[in-house]
Amino acid sequence: MKPTFKPAYHLLLLLCCYLLAIPSYGATKYVSTTGNNSNSGNSWALAWRTLQYAADQVNAGDSVWIADGNYAGFDLRTTGTATNPIVFIAFGNSAVINAPNPVTTDGINIEDANYIEVNGVRVINQPRNGIRLVFADNCIVRNTFCDNNFERGIFTGFTDDILLEYNECLNSIDEHGIYVSNSSDRSIIRYNICHHNNRGGIQINADGSQGGDGISTDPEIYGNVIYENGVAGGGAINLDGVQGAFIYNNLLYENHATGIALFQQDGNEPSINADIVHNTIINASNARWCILAVNGSSGAQVFNNILINQHAWRGSIALDPDAVAGFDSDYNIVVNSLSNEGDGQAMTLTEWQALGYDANSMIADPLNQIFLNPGSDYHLLNDAQAVDEGSAAFAFGINEDIEGTSRPQGSQHDIGAYEAEGSLVVDEEEETPDIYTSGITINAESISWARGLTGTLMLMNVEGKVIARRDISSADEYTLHDLVPGVYLATVHTPRGLQWSKGFIFSGKR
């Protein structure tokens, strides 16, 4: 079974529409296919009919719950604030936006509006982008499913401090799964799955031609699963004019262009000083390099990665001569093909080590001696060469793997995105929402869970704000006493996505 993130349309229906007022927040509104825009929007019985009408009415602090059904999208130009964001959140398991909004050719367009959250909708078959945000800082897009949109699943431009998490973006017809552009700084792109997109899986392009400084600084890209992208070119993680990127705990496999590409094309400066740590990259046989740094993209630090290329001669790492300055790499598993002269040349690991790189790195064993099930399950075998062969000193503070397992489990960090857990064999088929349904109990004043589960329990209020997180790897409970009485959504996420969710009412401490 491929590691997949279950998108937000798997949310279980909240069982009630009860709401107690929370003074620090704005109004809660409702949209339903059986609603009417002449209604107040204050309950499901009085729901509005269209998302655009809701977008025209909301103010800072308001939340809009969206019932199951098919909708045209919305264009939002009203801003929220840090303490009072505007949230559009799917209430059921299938709130689908399958027609563009009335202003642009995107499903959702958020423009000149900050502190907006979009949560849990499915956006499909759009003429341009599934979800578009421009001139929109401090926004969140989470738990969405963006399929078969012409340009990209999620597109952003001039969006500082954006958070994109737990989204699935697939089958973009022309370009990328996720595309962050135009001088956007401090992006966090985590726990997404991007697959079968025509070009890149995740692209950040600073694009100085559109204004701004043409540099995107300090993004964090981690916990993502990216596969089967790039038939028309475009790296699985493609960075143009991006500086100070921190790229870790990602699984990239069977992509058809570069794994991680650092370059300058539209950006005003090269993609310098990237830290690339604890990733697993398995390139397809028709791919380019696992890691490529060109156009002066110097200073890359490459440690504790599995970098396996199935191409006939392209290999693990290639640097242009002008990207060599400040580069360092070690404790990687590589193929016997590397280059400091760009794409057209290759040398052996021994020759590469003579240049001062990868002194403690090793040539990869066959895939079936490293991974549980190459092609579908890239957990490490317990006796894989990657186990205990990494270095904590070069882990850049990363003390968990892609699934939240603590590093190290043995005497030293394992190489790659996954940390082996001794004799534990992870059965992808067994970890299903049914296990979580039977293993998690919502009581009057607490949420408890049994042994044998994995993941992170998160509680969200009606505004879509995450108000609590707890690891559930051992039996325990979370008391609700600190919550304000009201309606809440409990979810469990693993790096494979949303596994379980349930709405509940907390009536207060007894």
Give names to the regions the model predicted:
Residues 33-67, 72-73, 352, 384, ...:
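Acidic Gly/Asp/Thr-rich repetitive segments characteristic of extracellular carbohydrate-active
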Residues 59-98, 111-119, 138, 352, ...:
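Beta-solenoid repeat scaffold
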Residues 73-80, 106-112, 129-135, 152-158, ...:
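Glycine-rich beta-solenoid repeat tracts in large extracellular/virion proteins
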Residues 85, 89-94, 114-125, 137-151, ...:
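Right-handed parallel beta-helix
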Residues 346, 351-419:
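C-terminal accessory segments
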Residues 358-360, 419-446, 451, 506-510:
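Residue-level detector of functionally pivotal "anchor" positions at catalytic/ligand-binding pockets or at interdomain
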Residues 442-444, 466, 485-510:
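C-terminal tail/sorting-segment detector
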